[in-house]
Amino acid sequence: MSTVYKLKTSERAPKNEDEDEEYVPVQNGQGNKHSAGFVPIKQKVLVLSSRGVTYRQRHLLNDLVSMMPHSKKDSKLDSKDRLYQLNELAELYNCNNIFFFESRRREDLYLHIARAPNGPTVKFHVENLHTMDELNMTGNALKGSRPILSFDKTFDTAPHLKVVKELLQQTFGIPKGARRSKPFIDRVCTLTIADGKIWFRNYEIRENEDKSKDPVTLIEIGPRFVMTIINILEGSFGGPVIYKNDTFVSSTMVRAAIRNQAAQRYVNRQESKLERQVRAQQNVIPEDPLDNVFA
């Protein structure tokens, strides 16, 4: 009898179509009911790095993961030549965006942002990076909160910048109702273009209780870094190059130029030394016969 009673009580009551669906707010991204007309946007970012990243690069990656609750962090990728395998990895984890840190020579850091599985893919060179621990800023925001993405108006001036803006928006933008996200907006992420580079900053939105001051103040949290666009591929880690930055100079070429300058300075010193020896041999002072008169 108890089994029959449980089966009867577990049956759902018929739904009344005349009644409107009650609005239940989403808490921590786990709610199943939404307001009428709300369609959740499913965005999930696969975050991983290559072998050989330094501790500063690893800490920067961890800071970005803490800012993106809709991300899925995976272990390091062993191969740097077969990046197309990241598409299979993204499909395995049900991710539609890929955020990949590639480290070379333990000095240069490259960032790949791709839309899986069909692309496009943008490759950046990351420099001037500073983690939250290094900056030690006073700003603080709720972990898992959704940010306001502030893009420079320069992003709308060129077609390739519009593509970059869309990929950055899908990567750093946390959709409403995302998993592990909080229903709060208390920070601003700014992406500004200056000197042909993209500058990333993260600020806290703090309200001032003093009415004589501005009602809202922005306080930097961190991290901060600068990105330079290298190229844009049509596919996800493959396909034809649809944009290439001709003004980009790699760090390897810069270091090679510095070494060549140092080597050229050494060559110039040796040539000057040889010229002094030749002049000394050509301009020999003749012996004076009167030097040995009183000897």
Curated annotation (Swiss-Prot):
GO terms for biological process: assembly of large subunit precursor of preribosome; ribosomal large subunit assembly; rRNA processing. InterPro entries: Brix (IPR007109), BRX1 (IPR026532). Residues 43-238 form the Brix domain. SMART domains: Brix. PROSITE patterns: BRIX (PS50833). Keywords: Cytoplasm, Nucleus, Ribosome biogenesis. Residues 1-22 are annotated as: Disordered. One of its GO terms (cellular component) is preribosome. It comes from the Eukaryota. It is found in: Nucleus, Nucleolus; Cytoplasm. Signal peptide: none annotated. GO terms for molecular function: RNA binding; rRNA binding. SUPFAM superfamilies: Class II aaRS ABD-related (SSF52954). Belongs to the BRX1 family. Required for biogenesis of the 60S ribosomal subunit. This is Ribosome biogenesis protein brx1. It comes from Schizosaccharomyces pombe (strain 972 / ATCC 24843) (Fission yeast).
